Structure formats: C-alpha cells, structure tokens
Amino acid sequence: MSPEHRRVMRSRQIFVTASAVFCVVGTLFGTGVIGTRVAESAGGDLAADATLIAPAGTAFSIWSLIYLGLLAYTIRQWLTPFADTPRHRVTAGLAAISMILNALWLLVTQVGWIGLSVLVIVALLLTLGLLAARLLDRPEPGISEFVVVDGTFGLYLGWVCVAVCANIAAALVGWGLPSEGALAVTATIVVLAVVVAVAWFLGRRLGGNWFVAAGITWGLVWVGVARLTDEPESVPVGIASLAAAAAVLFVTWRGSQERPADRLARGNHRDYGNHGDHGNHGNGRGGEPRPVGPGAPDATASTRPTPPTAAPAGPGPAPSPAGPAAEPVPPPAGAEPAPGASTEPDRPRES
C-alpha cells in the first residue's frame, strides 16, 4: 500500500470516528442526559401523541439497535480486513454524513426549529437511500458485513422512512393545521399510502431488503397500536397503519423474488439510456453482445461493402476486376492473324 493510499484510508477512518462521536453528543441531548428529551422539545410537537402518524413511545427503542450497529461499524472500520474494502470506500463517507445529520437533527429540535428539522431529516433519508443503493451494487458481503453494515443501515433507512412522515406532520401541526378531525385522518391515510409506495420502490431498487422492510414495518405497527390504544385515538388510521405494514411486507417479498439479472438490466437501462443505442452500451444491433477478444471485428468499423481497389502500378498484368482472366478465344478458321501478332502459343513466363 502506497503512503498516499494509506493516508486516504486513515483520513476516512478518522472522519467516520469523528462523526460517530458527534452523533453520541447529539444523542445525549436527545435523550435528555444533557438537554431536553425529543418528546418534550419543539413545544411537544414531536411527542407520541402530537399527531395521528406519531408512533407509540415503544417504537423508539429501535434506536438502541441502530446505535449499537453504528458503534460496531465505527470500530470495525479500524480493523485491517475491513478498512479498505471496495464497499467501505464507497459508503464510509455517506455513513459518516448520516451520523452527522442524525446529531444535527437532535440539536435543531432542541432549539425548536421544527421547520429546519424537516430539511435535515429529508437529507438524512436521501443519504441513507444512496448508501443502501451503493451497498447493493457491490459484491455479496460476508455474514459480519451483512449484519453490521447492511443490517444497521437497512434498519436505519426503514425507520427514517416513517420518521420523516411523522416529522412533516409535526411541523404542519406546529404551523396551525389541525391534528384531529376528518381532514387530518384523510391526510394521514394518504401519507401511509405514500409510505407503502416508497417501500415498493425500495423493494424493487434494493431487491427486497428485509432490513429496510423491518424498519418501516416496525414504525407502522406502532403507529397503528398508538392510534388504537392511545390518544389521539383514530380507528381508521390505526387499521390503515396495520394494513400498510402488511403491504410493506408484501411488496418487499415481491421485490425479493425478482432475479438479480433483471435488476441489473434495469440499472443498465438507466445508466446507458442516453448513449444512442437504447441502453445496449457495448452491444450489437438488437442488444446482442459483440464478440470480444483477438480476431473480433472492430465495433467502429463500417459494414458497407468495400469498392474494388485500383490496380497497382508497375510491371506485371493488372488483375481483372471481374475475376480470374478468361481463356483466350482462338480466331475463326481461315482468318489471318493481325499484323505483328505472334502465331506461337503462349509460353509460361520464367520467374
């Protein structure tokens, strides 16, 4: 490993570790150790009973698993076998940014900036979505990689899919929209349908990632439990939440049945759709692969017929463009030879 490569690797490790430390500081504020608990911040707009789509308090215990996974991820990236893998190189920066955004969200809510918190959590959602896509595009991981990396960030992404909806609803209520009533119930059910649509998209793009599905389902189930057993009570929202949780599991299962080759083909179509060959980048007409290797025809060569070349200058007979020379035709009987013509048969030339 070159000194420059080692320096880049070390910088990446330090960046991830510093982000994890910042995340811990934000968590200490969010849990009330050195600040105000999230449920009590922002005027109570983020409490479990503030909106119809707020999950029950028990749902937030998923953070214990997520934080444990982030800690394991941070420690693991210092170990030699995992410090410079292709997967880690393309995801470490996004993982660090996700921890920074997490802490930033907790700090923003401490001062009651509920509108800004929406922007932060949307940025967190996009970051985790990109990270999950990059993990899928890399070779299959080992068991520890699968649990620590795919598991942690899959749960993280799934939970944030629900949290971003709850955050937006809290902001709208904080700005004066009603938290109960027919309009609130209808809007909440529409939002639940959007969550299912997002899960469907992630199921297709990520190949049925069950960690993501678990995070989404966990949040939706506890939304349903809260609406059926706690204030603000809403039977329609409770039933819709549980139905949405079941729908998430179904669309994830459907996504897991799709062949990897189909997902790859869909990705290639997106990547090469503007390259002039309708996505068949590097392929021949109709998508058939061109031969590769020694003796293969040049893909850029013209397939038009080549016109006959001119006869080379110099001594010797010129080749006939019509093919091999025809046999000499003997003169008619009784005809006199042309002046100067030889009456002897042609002899082969000596080389």
Kindly label every feature range from the protein language model.
Residues 18-26, 94-105, 123-131, 149-167, ...:
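Alpha-helical transmembrane segments of multi-pass integral membrane proteins
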Residues 68-88, 92, 96-118, 122-145:
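Internal transmembrane alpha-helix with an interfacial aromatic "cap," most often the third helix
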Residues 210-221:
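Central hydrophobic cores of alpha-helical transmembrane segments
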Residues 8, 79-80, 134-139, 251-269:
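Membrane-interface capping segments at transmembrane-helix boundaries
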Residues 104-118, 175-182, 202-206, 228-234:
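Membrane-interface helix caps and helix-loop-helix hairpins in membrane proteins
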Residues 20-38:
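Alpha-helical transmembrane segments of multi-pass membrane proteins
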Residues 54-59, 179-195, 224-249:
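Membrane-interface transmembrane-helix boundary segments in multi-pass integral membrane proteins
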Residues 46-62, 147-156, 176-187:
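Short aromatic-rich membrane-water interface segments that cap or initiate transmembrane helices
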